[in-house]
Regions:
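Leucine-rich repeat
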Residues: 2-223
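C-terminal amphipathic alpha-helical segment
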Residues: 35, 274-306
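A broad, low-specificity signal marking well-ordered, structured residues that form hydrophobic/aromatic
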Residues: 45, 272-273
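A structural signal for leucine-rich repeat
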Residues: 118-123, 147-154, 170-178, 194-203, ...
Length: 306
């Protein structure tokens, strides 16, 4: 028996839908009664305001029919945001896939609130989420606090957080399956939250950390034997005391250090194959720290540019 014949008709259709962008999977509900709720079983979910406001791809659940963008665009966008929020509120708790393999959220208008992000992430985690990606960038700059159950999610393999997210790591937590962690310009609950998180990710392979003004991080040790790829960035206005990197398995390293003084210590990268370094100072010292690299890209920032 081949693999396809092992599926029921509905299971096969759901499998096919899972390969479509989620917004297109939703639109199939208008095809027939059989298709009406099939998208509710797709295990990969994505709600993206950027996609929603591309009028040529608008779906009747979210947007009214608009032939051209005019002076009423803002009110249309606001109304559409409310439609999308209501749609998620109604359907996400009822999503019938037993496992939500991935949930991707990207919101930037005032329609979406921090409490929404927290609730929707909590629902995904309760369904054994394997991938979570949240980009939250509202005008009011309120941070979304992640639910506590996230920090004990045994199934989570990929976690990507960006912008107005508050990462408040408890003292006791467990993410035993986490291999990919991207933290870009988020805020941390205290000066030790990021350090606690990195110190207890024993199988982490891919790490992206972008530090920015007001994120509460002052110093950081990246000591992760399993790490293969590291992208580490600091803005020029970071109030930062220093960092230490000890990653014996690392193969790819990207460093963007725009801080005013170099205060880094790179100790152990014997397997490094490629490095991409952007900095404002102490290039000679940085080069001495990555002597084993096979491919090196350098970008010298102007110290006078503010």
């Amino acid at each position: 028996m081949d693999k396809i014949s092992g599926f029921s008709d509905d299971e096969l259709l759901v499998k096919i839908l899972s390969f479509l962008p989620f917004k297109f999977a939703i639109t199939t509900s208008v095809l027939s009664k059989q298709w009406k709720f099939l998208w509710m079983r797709v295990p990969k979910l994505e709600y993206d305001e950027d996609s929603m406001y591309s009028f040529e791809y608008s779906f009747r659940y979210f947007l009214p029919k608009v032939k051209e963008v005019d002076s009423e665009t803002y009110s249309i966008v606001s109304e559409s945001g409310h439609r999308m929020r209501s749609f998620i509120e109604k359907n996400l708790p009822l999503h019938s896939s037993p496992v939500i393999e991935s949930l991707r959220l990207k919101f930037f208008t005032e329609v979406f609130q921090p409490e929404d992000i927290k609730l929707w992430v909590e629902i995904a985690v309760s369904r054994c989420a394997q991938e979570l990606s949240v980009d939250f960038f509202p005008k009011e700059k309120h941070n979304a606090l992640l639910p506590r159950n996230l920090y004990t999610c045994k199934s989570l393999v990929t976690l990507k957080l960006r912008n107005n997210i508050l990462v408040d790591v408890p003292h006791v937590f467990s993410l035993p399956s986490l291999k990919i962690l991207h933290l870009e310009r988020v805020t941390y609950g205290d000066g030790e939250s990021l350090q606690r998180l990195l110190s207890n990710c024993s199988v982490l392979e891919d790490l992206v950390v972008e530090l920015d003004t007001g994120d509460n991080v002052r110093k950081l040790d990246v000591i992760i034997p399993s790490l293969l790829s590291l992208s580490f960035g600091m803005s020029r206005y970071c109030a930062y005391e220093g960092y230490r990197i000890d990653t014996p398995s690392l193969k790819y390293f990207k460093l963007t250090d725009l801080s005013k003084t170099f205060s880094g210590l790179i100790e152990n990268m014997p397997k490094l194959e490629e490095a991409n370094i952007t900095a404002r100072h102490n290039f000679k010292k940085l080069l001495e720290l990555v002597t084993s690299v096979k491919r090196l890209s350098l970008n010298i920032e102007n110290n006078d540019a503010e």
